[in-house]
Amino acid sequence: MSHIDLALQELLEITGATRVTLRRDLPGDYAFPVTNEALLPGAPSLKEERTVDLKAQPVVLELLKGRQIVQDDCRTAFDDPRFHRMLEAYGGLAAQIVTPILKTRKLVAIVSLHQLGSPRQWGDEDMAAAAQTSERVAALL
């Protein structure tokens, strides 16, 4: 297990979430593919998912501003139909914390903490853990 995989696994265990992903800005046709992830047993992987255009997602537009996004109930977060299609494509994504990793003000990676199935009230400790993991991963990139 790589140091990045270990960091994601620890975040999964600390928060009790369903899935943690790392997306990186890599060359190629698909923006920000999932390069690493930690999953609860039975949770669907996003490593091969390529149907969602992340560049058109409202969450990514906020991440470009350097903001951590916290959504307790994703269904109420945005009206954008593309966002709602993403929720289904991602296995019934119900709640998430999405944290940008910026280098020289450029979005280079994204750490996402996902809760599938039902909305979830994220606590301050969940947000802090996601931010700390993002800092840890940034140092490894």
Q: Language-model features: where?
A:
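Signal-transducing coupling segments at domain and membrane junctions
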Residues: 72-95
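Amphipathic alpha-helical coiled-coil segments that mediate homodimerization
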Residues: 1-22, 133
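The cytosolic transmitter module of two-component sensor histidine kinases
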Residues: 1-4, 56, 123-126
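GAF sensory/regulatory domain recognition
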Residues: 9, 21-61
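Sensory-domain boundary capping and coupling elements
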Residues: 101-115, 140
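Short coil/loop residues immediately preceding or within conserved phosphate-binding loops
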Residues: 17, 58, 81, 96, ...
